[in-house]
């Protein structure tokens, strides 16, 4: 089975917008994150277990608005008793089966249902402010939040502070619209798509 990326028809490589005469650290970089395993884990209301007792690849399930991660895997809090697990590891399914009980958690494979765009650069928060009503001055590395971007429901994962890097996730069916919104907002600063 061949996997077709959600942005296959729109993600064009190259430099665009107001990039001429600028250093690489002054423009926005945009890339599609693909070939990730994505699972949603929801603790049942009837579950008596403490989430602090569970780990995936030695990562704890984080508290409100937090992310725990390493080089291959990130666990995002997306709501009360609700998390996304993103991993480049082919063994994520096995790790989840080994560590989480179907009697305690609803576990759903979302690997083909999300579009993920990674943005970085010093003007990143200005790009986000153009379409999202969140106070980005309060958000830092290893935090996550659900919001909207120009009317599209998104999840934001703040991956790094230096350079400022965020992953924006939406449903696959909104991926192209989100991509157009983000790239349009980036034209003012110039952007390079990888």
Locate predicted features.
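Basic, glycine/lysine-rich polyanion-binding surfaces/domains
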Residues: 1-194
